[in-house]
């Protein structure tokens, strides 16, 4: 959040903390209290102010405690552990006047907690967020893993460079798979003014705000689109007999999602045949080509696979597109 936004948030009031830097507004009426997490830490003093013009007859309650916590327009609490987090409500009579939610972001030995997301193996070591782009259109997908199946929420924001909090629009995070041990979430993002042919001077930054019950954490990934490119597999993979009856011609097309024109955004391809020959010995053959066809040997019990990557920049390879050699009739 930029300096101007912080000033605006605090002037809008409802909640004040001491010191100010120990707490900030995540969204309307939801606040994050940052805590040093060790035995002797004093915690943070938080002053809640009821958002009302009323002055008298106001009482305070908490979602997590049955007793009335105090009376008056303000309530001072000491936030030290998760029992102090949750919802705080001010009332007058039977009417709810305002409500605020406190989340805790804990720091141990100067390191912020990373308990909600699971580490994944990335290209440059371990990471919590993985992102891929299928082209240079500015559209990309990020995903992450968590062990929590319930009481978890995510929100995602993106930017082109940390100084500009806009420029990238991200959708709602969605669960795409899961079992009793691991759940995968993903989000689609789009750079608002993407120019596929322009040189990238600033990286894209993606921040995931993660909430599990009353715990808050955030995770950041910074990258250039060119570094997360992974094309879709080649499409329309076909085999036909060649003049040499012991070989076949395999042909394919660029994936529909790849950037155009293809003369500028060119792909290179890896063609691979593997299987067992008549003597049941494993055979594997690889061919690199910039064309969209190749001639290969293709035994009936083998298959042909083709994958693609950016011709001029060392992107990730696409997944394989494959076709069985049994689909073409050639004499052996």
Curated annotation (Swiss-Prot):
Q: What broad class describes the main subcellular location of this protein?
A: secreted
Check the UniProt entry and state the signal peptide residues, or none: 1-22
Instruction: Report the Pfam families cross-referenced here.
Output: Ig_5, IL12p40_C
Q: Look up the domain of life of the source.
A: Eukaryota
Q: Name one GO cellular component term.
A: cell surface
InterPro entries named among the record's database cross-references:
FN3_dom (IPR003961), FN3_sf (IPR036116), Hematopoietin_rcpt_L_F3_CS (IPR003530), Ig-like_dom (IPR007110), Ig-like_dom_sf (IPR036179), Ig-like_fold (IPR013783), Ig_sub2 (IPR003598), IL-12 (IPR050676)
Q: What is this protein called?
A: Interleukin-12 subunit beta
Residue ranges spanning the membrane: these are none
- As recorded in Swiss-Prot or TrEMBL, the protein's gene is named IL12B
Q: List the disulfide bonds.
A: 50-90
Q: Which family does it belong to?
A: Belongs to the IL-12B family.
The answer to keyword Glycoprotein applying to this record is yes
List where in the cell it is found: Secreted
List the carbohydrate attachment sites: 218
Q: Which residues form the Ig-like C2-type domain?
A: 23-106
Provide the species name: Cavia porcellus (Guinea pig)
């Amino acid at each position: 959040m930029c300096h101007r936004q912080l000033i605006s948030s605090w002037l809008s009031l409802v909640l004040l903390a001491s010191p100010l830097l120990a707490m900030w507004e995540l969204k309307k009426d939801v606040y994050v209290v940052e805590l040093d997490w060790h035995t002797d830490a004093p915690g943070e003093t938080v002053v809640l102010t009821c958002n009302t013009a009323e002055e008298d007859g106001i009482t305070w309650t908490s979602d997590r405690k049955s007793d009335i916590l105090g009376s008056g327009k303000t309530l001072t609490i000491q936030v030290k552990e998760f029992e102090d987090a949750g919802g705080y409500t001010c009332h007058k009579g039977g009417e709810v006047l305002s409500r605020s939610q406190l989340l805790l972001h804990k720091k141990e030995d100067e390191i912020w907690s990373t308990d909600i997301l699971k580490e994944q193996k990335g290209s440059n070591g371990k990471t919590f967020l993985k992102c891929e782009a299928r082209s240079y259109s500015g559209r990309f997908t990020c995903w992450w893993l968590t062990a929590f199946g319930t009481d978890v929420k995510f929100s995602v924001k993106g930017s082109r460079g940390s100084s500009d909090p806009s420029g990238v629009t991200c959708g709602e995070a969605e669960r795409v798979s899961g079992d009793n041990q691991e759940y995968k979430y993903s989000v689609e993002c789009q750079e608002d003014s993407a120019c596929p042919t322009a040189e990238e001077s600033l990286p894209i930054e993606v921040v995931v705000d993660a909430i599990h019950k009353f715990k808050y954490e955030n995770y950041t990934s910074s990258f250039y689109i060119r570094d997360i490119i992974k094309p879709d597999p080649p499409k329309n993979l076909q085999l036909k007999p060649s003049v040499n009856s012991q070989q076949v011609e395999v042909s394919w097309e660029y994936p529909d999602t790849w950037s155009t024109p293809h003369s500028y955004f060119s792909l290179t391809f890896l063609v691979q045949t593997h299987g067992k020959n008549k003597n049941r010995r494993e055979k594997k053959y690889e061919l690199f080509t910039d064309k969209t066809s190749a001639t290969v040997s293709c035994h009936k019990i083998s298959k042909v696979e083709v994958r693609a990557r950016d011709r001029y920049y060392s992107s990730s390879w696409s997944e394989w597109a494959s076709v069985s050699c049994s689909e073409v009739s050639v004499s052996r």
